C-alpha cells in the first residue's frame, strides 16, 4: 500500500500528557493542542519523505524503510531509528523509549505513540 498523500489531523487523544512526558514546554503544549496539523507523505518504493506542519513549526524527515536513519522529533531533537514496514499498511519505529505505529486504512492514517503507560493517538484524513 502506498502512503503518499496529504492528511489533516481530525482528532487526538492524550496530547497533553504525552507532550509533557517527552519534555515539551507547557507554553508550546497549550499553543499546539488545538492546531490541526497537516502531514504530507511521498512514498516511492522504500523511500519515504514526511513533512509535518503544526502552525509555524515544520518537521521534515526522509528515510528508507528498513535502514537506520536520523529522524527529527516533535521536540526538535535528532534521533537514530529504523522505520520498518509491517504488513502493507503499517510503519513502525522505536526511539527514546517511544514506539510509534502509523497505520493507513483507506483515507485515514492513525498514528499511535506509546511511552510507558501513556498512549498518544492521532487520527488524520486525506485531504
UniProtKB/Swiss-Prot annotation:
Modification N6-succinyllysine occurs at: 31, 36, 46, 57, 78, 84, 90, 121
Places the protein is found: Cytoplasm
BP-aspect Gene Ontology terms: cellular response to hydrogen peroxide; cellular response to hypoxia
Keywords: Acetylation, Cytoplasm, Lipid-binding, Phosphoprotein, Selenium, Transport
Gene Ontology CC: cytoplasm; cytosol; nucleoplasm; nucleus
Coiled coil: none
Top-level taxon: Eukaryota
InterPro entries: Calycin (IPR012674), Fatty_acid-bd (IPR000463), ILBP (IPR031259)
PROSITE patterns assigned: FABP
Function: Plays a role in lipoprotein-mediated cholesterol uptake in hepatocytes. Binds cholesterol. Binds free fatty acids and their coenzyme A derivatives, bilirubin, and some other small molecules in the cytoplasm. May be involved in intracellular lipid transport.
Similarity comment: Belongs to the calycin superfamily. Fatty-acid binding protein (FABP) family.
Protein name: Fatty acid-binding protein, liver
Organism expressing this protein natively: Mus musculus (Mouse)
Lineage: Eukaryota, Metazoa, Chordata, Craniata, Vertebrata
Amino acid at each position: 500500500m502506498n502512503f503518499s498523500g496529504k492528511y489533516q489531523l481530525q482528532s487526538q487523544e492524550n496530547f497533553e500528557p504525552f507532550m509533557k512526558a517527552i519534555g515539551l514546554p507547557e507554553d508550546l503544549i497549550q499553543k499546539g493542542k488545538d492546531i490541526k496539523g497537516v502531514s504530507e507523505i511521498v512514498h516511492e518504493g522504500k523511500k519515504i519523505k514526511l513533512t509535518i506542519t503544526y502552525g509555524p513549526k515544520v518537521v521534515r524527515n526522509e528515510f528508507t524503510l528498513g535502514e537506520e536513519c536520523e529522524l527529527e522529533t516533535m521536540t526538535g531533537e535528532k534521533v537514530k531509528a529504523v522505520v520498518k514496514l509491517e504488513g502493507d499498511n503499517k510503519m513502525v519505529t522505536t526511539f527514546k523509549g517511544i514506539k510509534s505505529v502509523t497505520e493507513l486504512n483507506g483515507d485515514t492514517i492513525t498514528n499511535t505513540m506509546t511511552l510507558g503507560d501513556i498512549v498518544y493517538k492521532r487520527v488524520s484524513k486525506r485531504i
